[in-house]
Amino acid sequence: VAHLNGKKSIGIQPCDDDGLAIFGAIDIDPKNYTDFKPEKYLKIIEEKELPVIPIKSKSGGLHLYVFTKERVKASDIREFLEKLLFIFGLPAKTEIYPKQTSLETTEGKRSSGNFINIPYYNKNDRVAVDTSNNELKFETFMKVIELNAQTAKTLNNFGATLIQKALEGESPEFKDGPPCLGIICGGLEKNNTKLDDERDRFLYNYMVFAKKKY
């Protein structure tokens, strides 16, 4: 209530003590906020009917939220959002929440994790938008969450289908390799999508693929 009334801004760490979460987000942090145009991402959401909710961030960028009907593995949410990075043509280093899939450190201690500012501060700041970039009232936002919430199964199936479609026209050399290589070599070229960190990402994933195959 204090957050909605503008008295205290609240951040949430999505991953709980059991390594589960009910939401995640991609943090699109543009290099130049003045020239940032969210329409590019809103168009992709609409065209591919993605179950994500775009929300204006505190800094002026865009957060792409996904919600689930129940607690699911934080790793499943991260995996789904990592696939979306390819779909949106975002760099691999783009921030994804939850940042942790477990709060237990290597020393056996508990980590507090990384927090993300939640939307609708004072009810009119960091608000959700539709694919036409129209701001949504808080009550509408809650209804949109309910309509877009996924189960663990539908989340995984949706992500797999997205990658399969993106791989159409992929390089045959990587048919038995990870999706990222096929997408970089063929799928993204077909969709006229460019990855800013394409070379480094390709080299890393190729080495992983080659080590396992040969």
Region roles according to the model:
Residues 1-60, 67-83, 214:
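Signature for HUH/AEP ssDNA processing cores
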Residues 26, 118, 207:
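A residue-level signal for conserved active-site and pocket-lining positions in enzyme catalytic cores
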Residues 85-124, 145-158:
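Flexible helix-coil linker/hinge segments at domain or subdomain boundaries
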Residues 6-13, 57-61, 89, 111-113, ...:
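Glycine-centered flexibility motif
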Residues 31, 61-62, 66-77, 114, ...:
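Modules that initiate DNA replication and primer synthesis
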Residues 3-7, 84, 145-148, 188:
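Alpha-helix boundary/capping residues
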